[in-house]
């Protein structure tokens, strides 16, 4: 349950995470040979209305729209660090304006239980939710001390933006 800081050992769980890490390593390797300064933002979870159904929130919204009284949801007993899309954009602009050079976590620093996202999205639909949990919950939470030290302040609550 340790928060991941910029120096933490990274062990991606998905193919997507592995490709992000490969890109980061590639850029760091290439930039070592130059005087080009670069900001590598490690963006944790976020959502937006244009995301595909491969992402959690759009997939849940799509399931809730279906004409069933009971929704069976699998594998949601996990904790993730979601940042509001508005704060994500603000953080990127902030880092650009201060010309930040290096690697930095861009996240909320808050743990969100995935079941709570499903419950929030289901509030108006009022469907019965049946959760089928996997055995071991997982935690993925960013340490954002570095971002805060630079002066960035979050303005938006993730749950108010979904």
Predicted regions mapped to residue ranges:
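Catalytic helix-loop patch of NAD(P)-dependent Rossmann-fold dehydrogenases
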Residues: 1-40, 51-52
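Nucleotide phosphate-binding site architecture
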Residues: 10, 47, 71
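The catalytic Tyr-centered alpha-helix of NAD(P)H-dependent dehydrogenases
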Residues: 12-19, 49, 53-57, 81-85, ...
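Conserved sequence/active-site signature of Rossmann-fold short-chain dehydrogenase/reductase
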Residues: 39, 46-49, 78, 88
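Residue-level recognition of beta-strand->loop/alpha-helix junctions
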Residues: 42-45, 133
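C-terminal substrate-binding subdomain of Rossmann-fold SDR/epimerase-dehydratase oxidoreductases
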Residues: 64-162
């Amino acid at each position: 349950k340790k928060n991941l800081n910029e120096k933490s050992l990274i062990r991606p769980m998905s193919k997507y995470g592995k490709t992000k890490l490969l890109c980061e390593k590639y850029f760091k390797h290439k930039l070592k040979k130059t005087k080009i300064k670069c900001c590598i933002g490690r963006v944790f979870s976020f959502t937006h209305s244009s995301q595909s159904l491969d992402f959690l929130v759009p997939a849940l919204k799509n399931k809730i729209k279906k004409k069933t009284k009971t929704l069976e949801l699998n594998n949601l007993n996990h904790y993730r660090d979601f940042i509001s899309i508005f704060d994500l954009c603000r953080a990127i602009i902030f880092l650009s304006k201060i010309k930040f050079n290096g690697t930095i976590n861009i996240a909320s620093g808050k743990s969100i239980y995935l079941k709570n996202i499903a419950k929030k999205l289901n509030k108006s639909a009022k469907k019965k939710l049946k959760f089928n949990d996997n055995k071991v919950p997982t935690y993925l939470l960013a340490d954002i001390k570095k971002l805060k030290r630079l002066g960035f302040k979050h303005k938006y609550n993730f749950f108010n933006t979904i």
